[in-house]
């Protein structure tokens, strides 16, 4: 990074000048702005004498002030030198604070907002609202000198005689060397700073020697900070030295510190995942009354609770059968407990949102609160299970959002009442805010819109009074409706006799009686004729206008809209219509085939299914259209219910006529307003529902993987951590050595060894010696190819030989036995003896190891380990502690695949949120020993998942314990200020403190200074009294026996008693719990049971045994093949490796071995094959069908017999058959496809003599080009007719442009035209001319843009812009990327300020032409000219809009191209000295005779494929 403001770099923004003039402060002299010079000088020179003389300096000119400053420096020069000698080996106070903060020895200073360091070009106060003023600065500053006017503010000190002749660069280098020398001296004498040498080494390893940030400590002229700059130095903050992005990544922002210090769970303070790179901090608002919230939350908790307590769902539909339990026992409904259930939900909401207790704490320590004891404690009913508690928390958040939105609406109503006096609207306050608007967040928002609709003029007046900005949200069509409703036509509306409020109230009450409707005494048209005139020329128009107003009023009512949504959710039908492209692309092998002909599938059937997100993805790809409908009879029933509330019960001609008009209003309301609105809502609702389902299934899969004990071989005790030897050969290439990494039982790397090949005798011997020396409990193996199977075989041979050596007995030899049966018996006996000495060899799930091996963290932790060695280390760690391995991944856990096909379709933030919940459940189930966790950096990864904590609070806890030392007991958490009361209650039970139980000396005095045996258990401190009482009863001790002892002494005595299980088992917990409940202590049955379990086996690991993958899972992990791809009956393609007489050895593309026996080469009716090597040759490709997969041996047996091939299948759909696929539609589509093929078969296929010609469709052409380079193309037939061809060329990875080429002057139907025209303007003589001068010329412009420093890949561009403006406040930035949505286009994106401050990334399209770029009407030959064109067009747009430099389009949150349907400033000439191309001064030069018209549209760019 350059330290010269005028230098250009990729990181700097450029300046947009809205008025076309240069206003760079570096070009102004100090005399132009003496106040600015004085302000900057004050930032550097802080001598008291100068401060006293500031008033006089104001009257002096700049030259006088500079001379006085120089004299002052000379006067202090000698004193400064003497002081510098004393400070040679010392660190500044600020440096010490930064070091101590990073070591965790002191609390960091509160972070403030980012400030400019002294000497910068301007201050925050001088800068207006951030604009794009500086976006193009680097393009212009490259023309400037390296020096700038900042050098004028501070004169250089006079140097010593010896240094008079040195250059500026030499002087700076000398200064840096002196500073480095001082740092080295301080490092060599750590006692001067209170930092030991090992800590110094660690600090230097992490933060470097500080030279990276020397620029932050240098003055404007490059000089180091001296005496006059000490004040500025003392104000130096973290933001002044470190990049804001790094501060954010380390969670050191002000918001992060606030979260860490607040006495609330971290996950309650952040809306999304605490692991997210972009956390959304929640506001601390008062939660609504839990009793009211419970009435909304309780009916929505789960299928189980709806079935049990609300009599919903068909009888017998719960429990749902599973694979493990296909015929579950029936569960009896308990509707009599509905009120008790709502009380339990209310209690849960109160604990979560008022008391701030997290779900794991409630589940483990407050489960009794959510259950009811019956039959005198002999049975209980559990109201809320663990996952249901999490759902209550989610629903509670939603209810709070609804409540807050309604409160905002209520406040607006209060302002209206205050303005209008005694106005009352009972329907709004009670019917809407009290009922309808509480139903959903959509209804809450509609309540605000209803208020704005009915009180538009009042709200407008209120906003004017409060000086609201014109940018405030504007309701659509309001002006037109207000005009209509203020006119005479409202009298005709009243004549309809329909009160929208009463209709809505009646419509909600199915069994209620509609309000009576009065009829006028005239016919509708007769009455409407009275309102004709200038506004309405006929009674029909007047009646239509009145109907329109009535429809609008009814359609705005939240109650009616909510009824429509509920109706669509219950009775909606979904139909899929494939597009023309979808009909050809989605074949029977496509993932979308199972819903290609989906017809009238009920909306409720999409619950608990990921199918809808696949449908949305297919629609996004342009393959299908999703339609929502409702059966005619159901829709008629809904409409009739609405008509019932609007019609009159009178009889007669007039009443019938008015009822007809009212019926028409209701039909219009339903079909034109309510159903379209409900269809849009249900689409997003089903998306959310499917995403939640996928995220939850991923969480469940994660918990299955991590909720297991460490691997334990026979003979190991429960809870013991194994020593592990991990081996891998990577991809199995000949260049890949076998890496072995040994971890001891404490997780330390004991050795790392490399073997060339374990089949070699020398390497095998070395491997056996390693086993003998390190004695691992288990050997784990992994790899990335089928070659891992060969490594496994070689390792098994070596392990068996090692076991034979330990046994000291050779295996039996067959020659020594008279018969084979005797030999087999002896061999079985020998193997049984050998089993005790065999070290287990297993595969483990390598998902965490794959991510760890390529992570930056792995490279920092083990820089000497090769990539495969880090992978082996990851395998070993997983075997020792799967939970810790997944916790260590942090946010990267979302990269692990838990649900194939589905997981990638949901947002990463949502997935991360649910996966974090899974880790929280798992870590809290097991608990953590806090002292060992803090001492081991690897174990620390689990601490954030303890209830109440998170990454920020965990860092604070680690820092505090490192500062104060290991904890003695749980009271230390609060005594040392590590936890507040709320966090202590959440976390205490999950954090144990290990002590030597036998050596404890417990005394009654000073319990806070002694260990407590209960702290070794997962018993919560609030239950210590129960535990102590139960131990006392189990030991048959009276109260007097323990009166003068430490309260937990009885616990220690019992825990040391080998018969404690029997003694505790004699306690009658049911009676004890029932008596406690009668005494008002509440239900404690579960708590008492957990206490007993912990006292018998404290911190015992209750998780299932370590899960070893199945053979098929191993094959999938190593090769990617599944039972669905190489299962029995599937067709495969194999390559012959070796053929012998009896069989053929082949290999599949995935590396799996395939064996073809001679008997399976040909059918019986064919000529017999006597020798396979006569039929098959090496490297020959053969088609076969799998007849027997053998996953344990990494091979399949195949057959090439024609009869077997006819029965084989090419593909097995990953999804089950959809019962709602229409067979008639499928048959019709297949018939149409067959007819099309028949027509093609009877038609002569066109052949063009050119190497790029291929008979492919658009999709096949893309697949063909996938492995090619940019600019490569395919020429193919066009579906538009015989006089056209199509050219598909590769723009970028996964981006292809399809160009329509018209043939002119064709000799005949099958010959190529003599003129090839693209979009009617680009003419080419032949295909080579078209490729070179059109395709290749366009591709070169893409290559050129990618060489520019502002180009970024499309998926990185947004992050690049956001990170830049965040790291450089006040600056703006722009960048380019390929537009994957519009092949042949570029994106020009720019951002003026951080998104958190309202910045919006805006995008302008840039068309890439053969040899040029087109931005609007400007056609430019190069990237520099493109940037200039952008500057000029943007400046013109600013001038047009008159926003005084503010970014256009920022208020509407839209890209400028959406304003008025046009790209800003693209519809007019680009101003540049009267020329077409900016900054060139002349017309765009001709780019070739073949492409004369660059200003016109390139065909098929971003358009349809041909």
UniProtKB/Swiss-Prot annotation:
Q: Which residues form the SH2 domain?
A: 1239-1349
Whether Transcription counts among this entry's keywords is: yes
User: Segment Disordered: which positions?
Assistant: 1-194, 1460-1506
Q: Which SUPFAM superfamilies match?
A: Ribonuclease H-like, RuvA domain 2-like, SH2 domain, Tex N-terminal region-like
Composition bias of kind Basic and acidic residues appears in: 14-23, 100-110, 168-190
Q: List the disulfide bonds.
A: none
**What PROSITE patterns does the record point to?**
S1
> Locations of Acidic residues compositional bias?
24-35, 45-62, 90-99, 141-167
Q: Where, subcellularly, is it found? A: Nucleus; Chromosome
Show the SMART domains listed in the entry.
SH2 (SM00252)
Keywords of the record, alphabetical order, are: Chromosome, Nucleus, SH2 domain, Transcription
Q: Which Pfam families match?
A: CTD, HHH_7, HHH_9, HTH_44, SH2_2, SPT6_acidic, Spt6_S1, Tex_central_region
S1 motif domain ranges (all copies): 1129-1201
Q: Which GO terms describe its molecular function?
A: DNA binding; histone binding; nucleosome binding
One GO CC annotation: transcription elongation factor complex
Segments of skewed composition (Basic residues): 66-81
Any one biological process term the GO annotation gives:
transcription elongation-coupled chromatin remodeling
The entry's function note states:
Histone H3-H4 chaperone that plays a role in maintenance of chromatin structure during RNA polymerase II transcription elongation thereby repressing transcription initiation from cryptic promoters. Mediates the reassembly of nucleosomes onto the promoters of at least a selected set of genes during repression; the nucleosome reassembly is essential for transcriptional repression. Essential for viability.
Task: Report what the protein is called.
Answer: Transcription elongation factor SPT6
Q: Gene encoding this chain?
A: SPT6
